[in-house]
Each structure stands twice: as C-alpha cells, then as structure tokens.
C-alpha cells in the first residue's frame, strides 16, 4: 500500500484546466522527483497535496484512506509537510520560536514555556539535522543562510512526526555546499522512514537522491519511471521534448 497517492486528480481554475486526471503515488521510505518545465502543473500539484487547493475531481489518499484536505492543517495532520523555497519561517523570530510557531508550549495559565521550547529546539537541531554554524536555538532566523533555514524547516517537520516532505525547489537559492548537505539530509530522512517529494527543475540534483521520477507536462503525467529503468539523459529528453 502506498503512503500517499493521487487518484485521477483534475483541477480547473475557471476555463483553465491546470491538472488533468493526474495519478501517481509515493511509497514508504521513497524519494520521488516531481519534474517538468514551467507551467507543467507541479506547483498546483503541491498546493493540492498541501491543502491550499481542492481538486475539481479525483481524490488524495494517505495509507489507503481517502482524504479531503480543506486547508494546510488538514494536510499536516495527515503527516505531510510542505517546505517552500522561502521555508515559511519568520525572520524576526528565533529558531526556537519558529520551530514551535503555531504549536507553542504553554502552562496551565496559557503562558509560553520559552525555556522548555528552547531546550527541545536544541535537541531537535542536534538529533534531527546537522547544521554547520548553528550553535544556539536563540539565533534569529533572519541571520541564517538559505541552507540553514531549509534545515530548520526540515527539523521542525521531523519533530512534529511528518511522514512525507514536499520540498518545493529546495536547492534554488543554496550554495553548492548547502545543496549537498540538504540532499544528504533527504537521504538520511529516508533511512529514518520519512518519504520526500522533490519538486525541482534541476534534474542533476533529483537524480542524486530520487528513487523514482514523475514528469509532468501541461497538467498531465507523461512519465513515471524508477531510477533503475532510466538515465539522466533520458529524463532530460522527456522534460525538454514534452
């Protein structure tokens, strides 16, 4: 049984059909590359899985159970975390406050337990992600590099027991070293039971870590192939020619 599956998803915005009968799945402990040129439908697909949009027809299932995501919270409660290019972090808050943003620990009087959140944040950063240069959860997120911000967002997702990460163009603003660290983290999370969907234009980055590739064009799936059955040259041809 697949962990996450899209079943004949169609999404229209007025007269525009953004997705047409899209079907694919993500397995347990699997990294899937969602590939395609601009306008292929990748962002719409991510927004549907994230609960931002609802399908016009078709449905999403998690562990074989049909889901009806009406908001991002529904998707998160099903174990899915979307990490966008901007990571949805607040630059003016500390790492600790960002990890618990919207999920703050309070006492019986409703007061924030800042010390407890700080201690847990430090444990999260040490155990879930190795982040060079971060030695304190008190650092402002605005002072972090792009790679460090991505790592904090991933650490937050892991701490809250997400089972599927949707990584939307995660390497677009990263240095070569940060990119290698992030791709390494995706593989590490796979070993720990977290599946990932890597949405990217960069086939070389996807090819390093993905087990399978789904290529989209004009809102439809044109290829669904395992890494063992293709090459990066063949993937490039499919993206360029479709």
Where are these regions (language model features)?
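Glycine-rich phosphate-binding loops of nucleotide-dependent enzymes
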Residues: 2-242
